Amino acid sequence: AQAAFERMEQQLVVDFYPWSRAIKLAAMPSSDYIGYFPEYYFETDKFIFSKPIGIGPLGIVEQKSRPISWHHLADLNRYTLGIVQDYVNTDSLDVMIASGSQPVEAATSDEQNIKKVAAGRIDGAVIDINVLHYLLKQPHLQPLADKLQVNRQLIANKQLYVAFRNTEEGRRWRDILRPSRKHKRRLV
């Protein structure tokens, strides 16, 4: 995203916040933030989406000593999974969570879920596999890497987008390929 904005003589500033806060900041009309990323596409009136900017393999982190066995998504209902509050997963999984058929524990971050899985407090956690690999390289989480693995089956390969506030300004930034002057806005 940074390179695309620079090619268009625009300045992109990226700040990092907990997921729920990032979404709230991007949705607020008075905020300095016009959007957030990465996001999976979902139906909403609050945001509009860029063209896909990448792919995120959505899977499950589990303990090596207690792998989760499943063939169909509904098979996961036998397990308690960690999810991150306000994350969009897949339509099918989110329906199971909303209906109560999928036991879950919500956390505020993927890092919290990784720690819960490693401690055996939950059976697994739904996570973007690229995020998992990045987090397990962080010094404070490296000791957990030997206990954990990615489940053999992915939930989905999801396209990633930038979500822009659904306003005239948001549409202008989404359509940044038509630059007319230098702007500076922020993404979370």
Name the predicted role of every residue range:
Residues 15-75, 87-89, 152-155:
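Acidic, polar ligand-binding/catalytic clefts
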Residues 11-18, 101-109, 113-116, 151-153:
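Short beta-strand-to-loop elements that line the ligand-binding cleft
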Residues 72-75, 128, 169-180:
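Short amphipathic alpha-helical coupling segments at ligand-binding clamshell hinges
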Residues 20-32, 48, 111-133, 138:
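Short helices/loops that flank or line small-molecule/ion binding pockets
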Residues 1-23:
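Start-of-domain marker
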Residues 8, 56-58, 142-178, 180-188:
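Periplasmic-binding protein-like
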Residues 1-9, 50-52, 75-77, 86-108, ...:
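Ligand-binding cleft/hinge of the Venus flytrap
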